[in-house]
Amino acid sequence: MNHVGRKCSMSAIVGATNAGKSTLVNVLVGQKVAAVTPKVQTTRVRMHAVSNHENVQLIFIDTPGIFSPKTKLEKFLVKHAWMSLKGIENVIVLVDVKNYLNQHLKKIIDRIKHSNLNAILVLNKIDIVHQSIVSEVIEYMYSLYKFSKAFTISALYGIGIDKLVDYLCETSPYGPWLYNDDQISDAPLKFFMAEITREKLFITLRHELPYSLSVVTELVEEKEDNSLIIKQVIYVTKGSHKTIILGKKGEMVKKISMESKSDLENILQVKVHLFLFVKVREFWQNHLNECVGYAE
């Protein structure tokens, strides 16, 4: 690979829960690399997503939403979020314009003040508020911290994304690319597969289930006809949650399986045979495999 004239930068995307971090990452990369659901705390581990623009490689770190942790799982999530701020060029502070008066956001700003990182303010969801509100939020955020640059976007509709990307490309330092031209993430394939199914679970059952469930891809096997056999286990903490996921006569888990299978086939471009199993494991949060979504 020719490194001459190439540029590369790494930016962590941080923010309060449900600010739209995973949606932004998917838009920046151009395809789905992170679960996007209406539930808070759907990002479990920090993940590198890669977007190449001519001679520039932009690496984005999708982090768990930063909040006040209580359980072991929550402490695991927040620890990984802060770890992502080490050895990077930029920290993108993503703010939901309708939820900017947020105590967790203030904690994020306080932490950044002591990091000496180039902090970029990005206001998301501008499509649902008046411009006067956007100006008010920018003024408030600059009263907390002097950001190097501010952008207004709608990650959902792709508004303002080009300006953000152009700025990141212009300010990226010269250096070798860290990932191959065709690589979009550093996450294992099994993790991607688990994320797809977990997303379907949260979208379908968001009013009935807590975020304390996990999907683990336990087996991926290629058949002679090049199709894939994928076996996944959905871990929940209560028997009642298992009943909800299974549904009457297994109809709910069948629906989720079909939706996940369809996405997997579109992404992988192969026929998929997906088998889902639901297990109750009261303290699954204490097991690494269940936290990260795949088993080796």
From Swiss-Prot:
**Keyword rRNA-binding in annotation:** yes
Q: What is its main location?
A: cytoplasm
Positions of the Era-type G domain: 7-174
> Gene3D superfamilies annotated for this entry?
3.30.300.20, P-loop containing nucleotide triphosphate hydrolases (3.40.50.300)
Report whether Cell cycle shows up as a keyword of the record. no
Q: How does it assemble?
A: Monomer.
Q: Which family does it belong to?
A: Belongs to the TRAFAC class TrmE-Era-EngA-EngB-Septin-like GTPase superfamily. Era GTPase family.
| Designated name of the protein | GTPase Era
Q: Origin organism of this chain?
A: Ehrlichia ruminantium (strain Welgevonden)
